[in-house]
Amino acid sequence: MSNPTRGLQREITLRLGARLVQEGNRLHYLADRASITGKFSDIECRKLDETFPHFILQMESMLTTGELSPHHAHCVTLYHNDLTCEADTLGSCGYVYIAIYPTQR
């Protein structure tokens, strides 16, 4: 049985995809709702560990301001520490779908 791909579907072979649970303006990461496509190097894994909380804070702020809305699909793109995070609620009223990958230059 193959593992399902989680998060936003992108044509990028190295990415972390996840479905975050939204509770008000807070986001919760559940490991069983995430998947990795490709293989991150040790350095990329450290960057991801360092950067992930920053992306969560930015997305929570966007939920507060309405830039990310649980009622309307709208993709936002965030950049930090040579990583890109795309996020969208897809109008799901309870989830934020993400894809995080190395920034393409």
From Swiss-Prot:
Organism: Escherichia coli (strain K12)
Designated name of the protein: Antitoxin YafW
Keyword Metal-binding annotated: no
Family indicated by similarity: Belongs to the CbeA/YafW/YfjZ antitoxin family.
Keyword Protein biosynthesis in annotation: no
Signals that turn on the gene: Expressed in mid-log phase at considerably lower levels than antitoxin relB.
Record's keyword terms, sorted: Toxin-antitoxin system
GO biological process, one term: positive regulation of cytoskeleton organization
Purpose of the protein: Antitoxin component of a type IV toxin-antitoxin (TA) system. Antitoxin that counteracts the effect of cognate toxin YkfI. It does not seem to bind to the cognate toxin but instead induces toxin loss by an unknown mechanism. Co-overexpression of toxin YkfI and antitoxin YafW leads to formation of elongated cells.
UniProt gene name: yafW
Disruption phenotype: Single deletion has no effect on expression of cognate toxin ykfI i.e. the probable operon is not autoregulatory. Deletion of 3 type IV antitoxin genes (cbeA, yafW, yfjZ) has no effect on cell growth.
Miscellaneous note of the record: Encoded in prophage CP4-6.
